[in-house]
């Protein structure tokens, strides 16, 4: 059994028996008077989103008018202490839930950024590929890189001009006419 004291105008002790059926079952006692909450039980069901609080109250001995007023005040402060404990538990649980949600959101944001980077990278590669294909179609770039092997003993010809057979005949005719006209003179 664990117990701790809740600070308040009068001293209270809160104990939780771990061998009880509910992990949220408490007994509140006031050391100044004989007032107790027995089997104070907090049930939180996440499936149905419901919270219930059950308790049994009792005082030991007979009460006179003054003791009755003390008992009422004690009950008030016990209720206040109980509400504080419940609020702390709820705040703790809500904090854990919000923390978990934050972690999930951070993971999701990271995945979204990775996908965006991958899409941008693929778009860049597709753009480069399309530009290269366009240049190949226009003949500005060879479609496949050609390996050039150099032979140091070979003679390099800087330029080669080909002439067609029609041009060759024309040249020959001009030469013959010019030579025959020079014979006539």
Swiss-Prot record:
Compartments, as annotated in UniProt: Plastid, Chloroplast, Plastoglobule
Keyword set, alphabetical order: Chloroplast, Coiled coil, Plastid, Transit peptide
Cellular component, GO annotation: chloroplast; chloroplast membrane; chloroplast thylakoid membrane; cytosol; plastoglobule; thylakoid
Main localization category: plastid
Compositionally biased tracts (Polar residues): 52-64
Ranges for region Disordered: 48-67
Keyword Plastid carried by entry: yes
InterPro entries reported in the protein's UniProt record: PG18-like
Pfam families noted in UniProt: DUF6825
GO BP annotations listed: thylakoid membrane organization
Boundaries of the annotated transit peptide in chain numbering: 1-56
Coiled-coil segments on the chain, per record: 105-138
Protein name: Uncharacterized protein At4g13200, chloroplastic
Organism name: Arabidopsis thaliana
């Amino acid at each position: 059994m664990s117990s701790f004291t809740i600070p308040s105008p009068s001293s209270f002790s809160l104990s939780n028996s771990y061998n009880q059926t509910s992990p949220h079952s408490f007994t509140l006692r006031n050391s100044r008077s004989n007032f107790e909450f027995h089997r104070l039980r907090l049930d939180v069901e996440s499936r149905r989103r419901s919270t219930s609080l059950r308790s049994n109250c009792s005082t030991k001995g007979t009460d006179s008018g003054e003791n009755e007023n003390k008992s009422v005040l004690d009950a008030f402060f016990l209720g206040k202490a109980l509400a504080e404990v419940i609020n702390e538990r709820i705040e703790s649980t809500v904090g854990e839930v919000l923390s978990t949600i934050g972690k999930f959101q951070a993971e999701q944001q990271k995945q979204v950024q990775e996908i965006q980077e991958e899409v941008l990278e693929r778009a860049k590669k597709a753009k480069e590929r399309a530009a290269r294909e366009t240049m190949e179609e226009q003949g500005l770039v060879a479609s496949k890189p050609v390996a050039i092997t150099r032979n140091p003993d070979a003679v390099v010809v800087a330029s080669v001009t080909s002439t067609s057979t029609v041009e060759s005949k024309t040249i020959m005719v001009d030469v013959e006419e010019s030579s025959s006209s020079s014979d006539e003179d």
